């Protein structure tokens, strides 16, 4: 149990001189730091020395009310446990990198006519995967480029299996029409092979093959085919110019550089991904809780948190020396092959590192400019509302269509940025459809009932997308919950509903507050309100589409769950069912001629 009078020096004497992990707790029982050690007694005792501690560590030590330890069999095991605990507990004094979703891949499915697709998740040996890519946008743009060059299908099998005529992608020359037999399996497989070779970095081989085909077509006076192959070569060369890294070979590597702004303790880590000699793009990370940490400490935290339990390229190039021996062994064991971490690259690899360092510095500068702007906006809002202090703002919006599929959203702004990991949507049921006041009451009660019992962070300000009626309801809820000390502000649209004409409804004054359309406080309110609106609409549309997809068919007499599922599976969704002829509908299991005619009529 945490003890306000915790004696660290006495506690150290009870620790073994063995490898392990230690967790430091404050008086509230929260874990504020997690660390690993080869020798627990020696490492933990270093925190209770009279000298040599940084101001940050001194502050942390002053808050320690207890320490928990776990002995491990080795330093490697301690590192793995430390990494898992940091990710799960997010202690305030550990450097934290956001644990993103798994990286996306480009997928070629196993099929007589393989499908080209975006994929994120566990890998299946039956299919071909290319990547990983730094973000979804790079994958999607790559798919578009490959469609243009190789004309591979992207449709789901459920759609592919039941098409009777080519789709729009065929008409705009982005697909070769395998669904209706407009290309032979052999010719299609050749296109798949060329696409795979290109993704594997064998661009020159692919270009040479296409060039030979072009000359053959020209010799045979098939000038239309020769022109198509020429265009294909030109498109591939453009892609090659954009993405190829002059490596001399098809190399897989990650290049990592770090930039630090000491005065603000801001840090940016840039990760450049090179796969099969192609520059797939880069991604920048902004860690939390950095304080006065140096570049080596930040990079070591990044490599540990980013690569353990994730696919790793054979080469990782770092912009600063770190303790590589243990990490290199762990990553190699995890990958099943040798992983090399190098901190002193030369030649072309040094150029890659310089590129990553420039990316990190640029991203850091942009982030600091944006943060300064956000700080100015937040300060302006604080002054406009005459509030003592603002850091965390939560905003609510309600979205529905004539009372259908009502969704409430809550978005969070904290520490000068939107925190989308803390966004929440709420399904609103059990109210009169279209009653926005009841919907707002419901979401606020659900959101803040737990907070009233000290189970989470309380906001410094609550924004409500609505006018006096919504604010009245919100005030009643907060009084009922005993949270009426949290300021509420309603954001009401002006008479013409144009941005810049918003009225701010303040419960503590009679008149609405009007801010000039160029006021930084208004810009911040608009930013947060628009994000709540977007998030609510997105959830509402998804819920409405799901509801309508089910109900439209089930409202037809004779269509139950089983027949509905058969129809949706056969035609790849409700749109396919609507486009089907009576004869095509009748071919579905369980659908008679008369029922097919009824479905056809009802969906028109």
Swiss-Prot record:
The disulfide bonds in this chain are: none
A GO biological process this protein is involved in? SOS response
**Keyword set for this entry?**
Cytoplasm, DNA damage, DNA excision, DNA repair, Excision nuclease, SOS response
Q: Key word DNA repair present in the record?
A: yes
> Is DNA repair one of the keywords UniProt gives this record?
yes
Q: Which GO terms describe its cellular component?
A: cytoplasm; excinuclease repair complex
The lineage's top-level taxon is: Bacteria
Question: Which residues does the UniProt record annotate as the domain GIY-YIG?
Answer: 17-95
Tell me the InterPro entries matching this sequence. Answer: GIY-YIG_endonuc, GIY-YIG_endonuc_sf, GIY-YIG_UvrC_Cho, Hlx-hairpin-Hlx_DNA-bd_motif, RuvA_2-like, UVR_dom, UVR_dom_sf, UvrABC_protein_C
Compartments in which it is found: Cytoplasm
UVR domain location is 204-239
Q: Which family is annotated?
A: Belongs to the UvrC family.
Its assembly, as annotated, is: Interacts with UvrB in an incision complex.
Role? The UvrABC repair system catalyzes the recognition and processing of DNA lesions. UvrC both incises the 5' and 3' sides of the lesion. The N-terminal half is responsible for the 3' incision and the C-terminal half is responsible for the 5' incision.
Q: What is this protein called?
A: UvrABC system protein C
Natural source organism: Nitrosomonas europaea (strain ATCC 19718 / CIP 103999 / KCTC 2705 / NBRC 14298)
